[in-house]
Amino acid sequence: TPEHQRYVELFIVVD
């Protein structure tokens, strides 16, 4: 789902 993708993108930024 788009929501999940957004979370993954955020996680990468945090990392």
From Swiss-Prot:
Contains 3 disulfide bonds. It is found in: Secreted. GO terms for biological process: proteolysis. The keyword Iron does not apply. It comes from Bothrops cotiara (Cotiara). This is Snake venom metalloproteinase Bco22. Belongs to the venom metalloproteinase (M12B) family. P-I subfamily. Its cofactor is Zn(2+).
